[in-house]
Amino acid sequence: MAHKKGGGSSKNGRDSNSQRLGVKRFGGESVLAGNILVRQRGTKFRPGNNVGLGKDHTLFALVTGKVKFEMVTKLKMQVSVYPE
């Protein structure tokens, strides 16, 4: 017979790593070509002038310049980069 009761195992105690999504460069900031502007799931922000869209929907600058966030419609926002 067991001298002590079996220690129960907890079913909690796990968590996933954060995905670190969100805006990385804000409006008016200067960026270099290739800088990541927004990390997102789906196209919450759409690519505008001089902005590329990665396969995971990441927006990145195609040219060096200043970031501008623009409303396309009431619901859609696009991110553009204008050369200085």
UniProtKB/Swiss-Prot annotation:
Entry protein name: Large ribosomal subunit protein bL27
Similarity comment text for this entry: Belongs to the bacterial ribosomal protein bL27 family.
Presence of the UniProt keyword Transmembrane helix in the record: no
SUPFAM superfamilies reported in the protein's UniProt record: Ribosomal L27 protein-like
Gene Ontology molecular-function annotations: structural constituent of ribosome
HAMAP family (UniProt xref): Ribosomal_bL27
GO cellular component terms, semicolon-separated: cytosolic large ribosomal subunit
A Pfam cross-reference name: Ribosomal_L27
Region called Disordered, residue ranges: 1-24
UniProt superkingdom: Bacteria
Keyword entries, A-Z: Ribonucleoprotein, Ribosomal protein
Keyword check for rRNA-binding: no
Example of a GO biological process term: translation
PROSITE patterns found in the cross-reference section: RIBOSOMAL_L27
